[in-house]
């Protein structure tokens, strides 16, 4: 964004956006902006959701955290009905990996959630881990077609938070803890994957762990 502290101009590696936010910046650059949210933050009937969805030309709130199939159908319809020559900015908030860790066709019941704030009889770190991993694997299969359409574009996959599964007596998120602040980040810039390089601190952490077994 303009005045964000990055002084470079448009180049082969970057370009500058101007606007109230990133989505507005892409719209001003001529992009078709398409977005879909699953978690309640994006509920367009709320004040917060209306603010988050307003910058998009097209936006769909799924209504719950287990509607990825509907979201992908809606996005595909938007892509088919817009000018294929116009660049697209697509935002997708996936809910299945969010509590209660459930996806369409899952072999377990949606409720009770294995992870709730402050704990409870239904809480289980083992179930939380296995169900979230299963949801992630299912999501991978569903996203394949959409990602393939943008394989030569810039793609960013991340999470807004992690979850606590009993660490230090804590559960779920909405709290400051290393488990909630650790998130995945995968990037492909203009078709090329970004490979991370180990930092000195990470290298020392690996060495310290190895020493425990020597």
Spell out what each predicted region is.
Residues 1-214:
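Catalytic domains that recognize anionic headgroups
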